Design a protein with these regions (language model features):
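Interhelical loop/hinge segments that connect adjacent transmembrane helices in multipass membrane
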Residues: 1-6, 182, 197-239, 243, ...
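N-terminal membrane topogenesis motif
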Residues: 1-24, 78-85, 122, 151, ...
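Transmembrane helical elements of multi-pass membrane transporters/channels
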Residues: 8-25, 163, 184-199, 203, ...
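Helix-terminus/linker motif at the lipid-water interface of multi-pass membrane proteins
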Residues: 22-40, 111-114, 175-177, 236-269, ...
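Helix-loop junctions and terminal segments of transmembrane helices
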Residues: 29, 58-74, 148-149, 207, ...
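Interfacial/gating helices of multi-pass transporter permease domains
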Residues: 31-55, 83, 122, 181-184, ...
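Hydrophobic transmembrane helix module of multi-pass membrane transport proteins
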Residues: 91-240, 380, 452
Length: 504
């Protein structure tokens, strides 16, 4: 049952990420050509600042998912209701705080970009972009955490996938007929809000005994402060770059943020793709840990890590070779700022590697609820990021900021590998490091050869796509073969596990 639910979640999440990836690649290009790099940079920057304000969520969602694992597994309906009631109260408080912080941002943000765009456009854009988060706090959040904890995240994923398609089609149509950027984003926010109705209908039918107004058990969310700390760190680490660029680069800040946003569009697409292979598994691992099935955990984790690393290094090999040609084609008609920068291509590829190599271990840490135990490591990650970024931005610009991100991700990712080995999946670090090193060596060779074989200046998406297919097939062949030769038993076990899940 766990395997089948995990497969459903993984497939639905993968579908969502593919759709989000396509939308994330297509829409910004229309926005760039219709409204220019400064507007695109402003939208990117505002979204990052709103992510900071998302700290108002205070770790409630993460803590709720962890708290629900055991009562859902043991079918303790009253306990589930009391936890969800407490979650509803916390989400309502978070929504009010987020609204207040948004109003503050509306007042101060225009001063950061003074003279680059009209203040009225910027202020209204902040309010429009904040709308979807407000809906999440006041209405959708409590349903989403329940479905995630009960291994039904695929429901939310499928509904969101449909909404993303509708949003993309409607937005492109509005841009095509000459609508203003503010109206386009307002309609997009409206489409996002509609998914609330579908999620609510599903939950009401599937869980008729739920009571979000039962006696709240706020003590069950004791992990929320520790989860909040990790959330704070995650937001700082993931959004420091845009914030530093916006504040420190003066009159050219929005143009540089636009360049950053195009590369991050690729990074986010890759990260979303990789996330689809872990999203559906956290709840399953949480159930295994809750039931103390140590041997099952060890075997399942090894298979998961093996599969994840194979996929991850295939993707990184392709990204390392193809990111610069892609950016060149994507921005071929834009002349207001230089987008193709080889150093950025290398640094963003390193960032993707450092971000994703931690995911298998992080999945287990989240499933076990080890937020308090890992808080100091998380704080150090944020300190490294901010310190190095601010120290290098004045001399090296965007490259200096990215070096700060590489350093912080590098420290934290490998610390997670060893923490998982010490406390959760005993003794797994040696195997993990061996897998990482052999795949890094393989990918380094693939990237070196690939950059000589594939032209780094391409003028059409068709040509780029054909080269991408060739690079993809080559990477799949070499990475899969090398991992099969080195660990044939793990390969066969993974294949049998997938076959068993599909047959069920």
């Amino acid at each position: 049952m766990r395997g089948k639910q995990a497969l459903k979640n993984m497939v639905a999440s993968l579908l969502l990420q593919v759709i989000v990836l396509l939308s994330g690649l297509i829409l910004p290009r229309f926005i760039l050509e219709a409204y220019g790099s400064s507007v695109n940079g402003m939208i990117t920057s505002v979204n990052q600042f709103l992510t900071y304000l998302g700290l108002a969520e205070a770790g409630v969602g993460t803590a709720t998912v962890v708290a629900l694992y055991t009562p859902l597994a043991l079918k303790q309906t009253e306990e589930v209701n009391s936890i969800l009631s407490a979650t509803r109260k916390f989400y309502n408080k978070s929504g009010m705080l987020f609204l207040a912080l948004t109003l503050v941002l509306i007042g101060v943000y225009p001063f950061f970009i003074s003279g680059q765009l009209e203040n009225s456009l910027v202020r209204w854009m902040i309010l429009v972009l904040a709308g979807s988060t407000l809906v999440d706090y006041f209405f959708l959040g409590k349903y989403r955490v329940l479905l995630t904890a009960n291994q039904e995240g695929y429901v939310v994923a499928l509904i969101q996938a449909a909404g993303t398609i509708v949003n993309m089609v409607v937005s492109i149509f509005l841009i095509y007929i000459g609508a203003g950027v503010l109206f386009v984003k307002a309609v997009a926010t409206g489409v996002y809000m509609l998914r609330l109705v579908l999620v609510k209908i599903y939950v009401k039918r599937k869980y008729p005994v739920l009571d979000f107004y039962a006696e709240p058990n706020e003590g069950a969310l004791k992990q929320k402060n520790a989860a909040l700390l990790h959330q704070v760190v995650g937001i700082i680490v993931n959004n420091t770059d845009t914030t530093v660029l916006t504040i420190c680069l003066g009159a050219k800040s929005l143009l540089e943020v636009s360049v950053y946003g195009i590369y991050m569009m690729v990074v986010n697409a890759v990260n979303q793709l990789m996330t689809s292979f872990s999203n559906g598994l956290t709840a399953g691992f949480g159930e295994v840990i809750a039931k103390n099935e140590e041997e099952t955990l060890k075997k399942s984790y090894s298979s998961y890590e093996y599969m994840y690393f194979v996929i991850m290094f295939i993707v990184i090999a392709c990204m390392g070779v193809l990111i610069l040609p892609f950016v060149g084609v994507y921005t071929i008609n834009l002349t207001d700022v230089q987008y193709v920068r080889p150093v950025l291509g290398i640094l963003f590829t390193l960032i993707v590697f450092m971000q994703n190599v931690r995911i298998p271990g992080l999945t287990i840490i989240c499933a076990a609820g080890h937020y308090k135990e890992t808080r100091y490591q998380a704080i150090l990650e944020a300190v490294i990021n901010i310190t190095v970024s601010l120290g290098l931005v004045w001399k090296f610009g965007m490259a200096g900021v990215l070096l700060g991100t590489v350093c912080s991700y590098g420290y934290r990712s490998f610390e997670i590998v060893f923490y998982t080995s010490r406390h959760l999946v005993k003794g797994c670090a040696k195997k993990s490091m061996f897998r990482i090193l052999r795949n890094v060596f393989t990918v380094a060779i693939l990237c070196t050869v690939g950059t000589y074989v594939i032209p780094q200046e391409i003028t059409s998406f068709t040509t780029w796509f054909l080269y991408a297919i060739g690079m993809g097939l080559t990477s799949v062949f070499f990475v899969v073969v090398i991992n099969y030769v080195v660990e044939p038993d793990e390969f066969m076990q993974l294949r049998h596990r997938v076959n068993d899940i599909i047959k069920k």
